[in-house]
Amino acid sequence: MTFDSFADANEAEVTRAITRQWTDEFLDDTETDVIIVGGGPSGLMAAKELADRDVDVTIIEKNNYLGGGFWLGGFLMNKLTVRSPAEAVLDDLGVPYEYDEENDGLAVADAPHACSAMITAACDAGARIQNMTEFTDIVVRDDHAVAGAVVNWTPVHSLPRELTCVDPIALEADVVVDATGHDAVVVSKLHERGVLEADGIEHVEEHATGMDQSGDGEYGAPGHDSPGHDSMWVADSEDKVVEQTGKVHDGLVTAGLSTATVHGLTRMGPTFGAMLLSGKVAANAVMDELAVDEPRVDLPSTAAPAADDD
């Protein structure tokens, strides 16, 4: 077959096609079963598992891209690690990996391959995405039960205040998942209003530790300075993050690093098994909240405990 030409379409038709499809989907997003705030590995995994079970899921992501820190393995190196038994997730995604020559319980994979496969799996399952969309507040009901998310377009946040006043809008959901990573921004809204106590967020307030202390218009470090969670301890952190993932308030579930921040847990650094399995646990917590009559998400078999140091 030889190429002849593209189908005929003019500029106005292109614009209408984009606008029509986006509007139709966004109208569906105004009332949904679950809103997942944050499109990193834990949020994507939760979305994939829920959508696989016919739960309506919308991911809100403030960046133009999905994946969070999953695109890199740390220190600008694009190899990532997962500790056994989480390599089973890579098997499910069709991502090749090798076991480290020093530790056969540590699987190493290409980060771009793993991240793009995770994004594809969530989209293929039916999760809807609203990227360049920033979470600004929660929708609440009696006793501050969480009932949705207040959002605005991300670029609005970067405009000088004196130039713009753009009100946000609200999306309703039966459950919201905080998968926003280090900052745990959804839970923070309840904490700052005295609705719940979060050890890590309280630490931030007491010690003025934050993700980025640079001023407007300045370049700053990305803030890996233990803003709310504790310092790095891989073996301790990953198990506890998975164990403590779940419901923290009516209508609100945490997943991934937001769980570490909420509970003041240690952090795991550049290894992603806990992020992926936490997303699965979060999906189960959401289904419990929704009373979904579908099979629960299975977790891979527990790895053998590490040998004590000599």
Swiss-Prot record:
Reactions it catalyzes: [ADP-thiazole synthase]-L-cysteine + glycine + NAD(+) = [ADP-thiazole synthase]-dehydroalanine + ADP-5-ethyl-4-methylthiazole-2-carboxylate + nicotinamide + 3 H2O + 2 H(+)
InterPro entries noted in UniProt: FAD/NAD-bd_sf (IPR036188), Thi4_fam (IPR002922), Thi4_prok (IPR022828)
Keyword 4Fe-4S (UniProt): no
Positions of modified residues (2,3-didehydroalanine (Cys)): 165
Cofactor: Fe(2+)
Residues annotated for Fe cation binding in this entry: 167, 182
Residues given in the record as NAD(+) binding sites: 42, 61-62, 69, 167, 257
Keywords: Iron, Metal-binding, NAD, Thiamine biosynthesis, Transferase
BP-aspect Gene Ontology terms: thiamine biosynthetic process; thiamine diphosphate biosynthetic process; thiazole biosynthetic process
Annotated binding of glycine, by residue: 267
Domain of life of the source: Archaea
NCBIfam families: sulfide-dependent adenosine diphosphate thiazole synthase
Subunit structure of this chain's protein: Homooctamer; tetramer of dimers.
Family (UniProt): Belongs to the THI4 family.
UniProt name for this protein: Thiamine thiazole synthase
Source species: Halobacterium salinarum (strain ATCC 700922 / JCM 11081 / NRC-1) (Halobacterium halobium)
